[in-house]
Amino acid sequence: MLEALIFDLDGTLADTEETHRQAFNAAFIEFELWWDWSPQRYTELLRISGGKERIAHYIGTLDAAAAERARLIELVPAIHRTKTRIYTELLEQGKRPFRPGVAKLLRSAREAGLRLAIASTTTSANVETLLRVNLAGEPQLAFSAIACGDQVRAKKPAPDVYELVLRSLHLPASRCIAFEDSVNGLRAAKAAGLVTVVTPTRWNAGQDFSAADLNLNSLEEVDIPRLESLLGKAHAAA
């Protein structure tokens, strides 16, 4: 029986990646690094989960002396804090709406008595800001559990953040469905034993989502009865 829907945040609930990219570049300028992550480069970097991890990976690709790389690595936490501040300011200034079909699915889920949860690699501050600007005036859509990347030891594709959500919900994976937009997210959800629906964005449309239980262009294509059927069929075939 379906009891909860667990959503990734960035790219799944809202297409926030361009805003993240702009925030990274603005943070780099504040640190006088003059790096510039183009849309193409950022698409490649999205294969690395987590903002701090993404910056560290990028530093590892630079043609720089070992001492300079070490200096830059030490700056990563501060750069990321600055990026988070800029990102939340950008969200507050220009509302980043949910993707098509998301708000309707959230309302339908609550009307059906289902619980809502978030499992994201982003920071708690980013989650809180995005939900606040999108759910103002709709307290009935409150999420029962929220797990973020800064609360677990290993980020996606490790299942830690999903396992934390399941513990918070006090539910087994067999009664929940996860929603993702990336291969790392899909792997994390499947490793936690969850039936998973994928809705890619332009940032990850070329990734291999063959392991997903359902692959959609938009959450406009799904409703609660279809999700209940998907969960039942997946566990019957297991």
Residue ranges of model-derived segments:
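Asp-based, Mg2+/Mn2+-dependent phosphohydrolase catalytic module
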Residues: 1-2, 107, 123-125, 129-238
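N-terminal helical cap/lid subdomain that shapes the substrate entry/recognition surface
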Residues: 1-9, 13-100, 107, 111-112
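Conserved SAM-binding loop
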Residues: 13, 116-119, 178
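Residue-level signature of catalytic and energy-coupling elements of molecular machines
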Residues: 24, 83, 120, 158, ...
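Residues at secondary-structure transition points
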Residues: 70, 74, 78, 93-100, ...
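Structured helix-beta-strand junction loops
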Residues: 93, 112-113, 149, 211
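Small-residue-rich anion-binding loops in enzyme active sites
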Residues: 112, 116-118, 124-125
